[in-house]
Amino acid sequence: MIKAGIIGATGYAGAELVRILMNHKEVEIAWYGSRSYVDENYADIYGNMFQIVDAKCMDDNMEELAESVDVIFTATPQGFLAGVLTEDILSKVKIVDLSADFRIKDVATYEKWYKIEHKSPQFIDEAVYGLCEINRDKVTKETRLVANPGCYTTCSILTAYPLVKEGLIDTDTLIVDAKSGTSGAGRGAKTPNLFCEVNESMKAYGVASHRHTPEIEEQLGYAAGKEILINFTPHLVPMNRGIIATEYATLKKKPDGTLPTYDEIKAVYDKYYANEKFVRVLKKGVCPETKWVEGSNYVDVNFVIDERTGRIIMMGALDNLVKGAAGQAVQNMNLLFGFDEAEGLNMVPMFP
């Protein structure tokens, strides 16, 4: 049994960490960190935890926390962990960071897109990008710092990764159109996220400027073995949770001048995902739906070949708070400590 501390336990991703870890047989939550609710009962903030969690919220003192737990989850805004992380802290505890502070390897790129100065760039190189299905062999018991991928990025990367890796699409033509529920914007009160602003409406935002763009480009670039530039456009939709990504790219023709067939593309997806518990490649003609993955750690993917245009449409769906945040963080923790990778994550998707 290990002890875990959560900084940001009262945000949506932090609360989802609590929900998941409560059912993990190898973990005890020892620290419910929340700068906003210090000394308040956790169950008073989240009523669904009434008579389940009997603990008060604590502060975000990383130095003290590192002395008392085996792993820290930082479900915090960008800049928090980078601003407090020291070698002394990392020498005592493993950290899974749900922010973007250590996802992007180039400091200048991070500072350009997030518009803040990176306070601890000396730890970027050692941070492992924790997209388990791709970097599983790098998340080991020796790893100290895991950069948990973003929600849009997890969905976008896993949806296209097999075809990028195998060189079956022209990456210069890749377009990612993604839609997310409002929980992706966090729990803080913001006028654009009020019920009357969001209900019965959809909108694009961060057009040509969303900060998950360089993260997607960097990871798919590693897969392709070259620099990649994409068009990424996110949209806000009036639902609580879920992300769906629809991605478009031109298929590369085979030597005989014909397009790859459905069976050939399906074989590529199966090559990468047939043995992945949390990635489900759907049957032919079935399009992913956010409702099918809600509350779970699954990613559903599929594709359609448009022979008329020579393009392929790739689709993916996940729960932004689970596989897009807390579930993936627990998956990484399991790898860090040598637990069964699926421990605590065998949640059946909720429906309806």
PLM feature spans:
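Short, solvent-exposed beta-strand edge segments and adjacent coil->beta transition regions
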Residues: 143, 202, 242-246, 311-313
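A short coil-to-beta-strand element that immediately follows conserved catalytic motifs
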Residues: 29, 171-176, 227-231, 278-283, ...
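Generic secondary-structure signature for well-ordered alpha-helical cores
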Residues: 22-26, 165-169, 210, 218-225, ...
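Conserved active-site and cofactor/substrate-binding residues in soluble primary-metabolism enzymes
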Residues: 12, 126, 154-158, 207-215, ...
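C-terminal active-site/capping subdomain that shapes the small-molecule cofactor and substrate pocket
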Residues: 248-352
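N-terminal Rossmann-like NAD(P) cofactor-binding subdomain of oxidoreductases
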Residues: 1-200, 205-207, 304-307, 348-352
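Oxyanion-binding "anion nests"
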Residues: 209-232, 236-240, 244-246
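Short Gly/Pro-enriched turn/cap motifs at secondary-structure boundaries
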Residues: 204-208, 235-238, 290-293
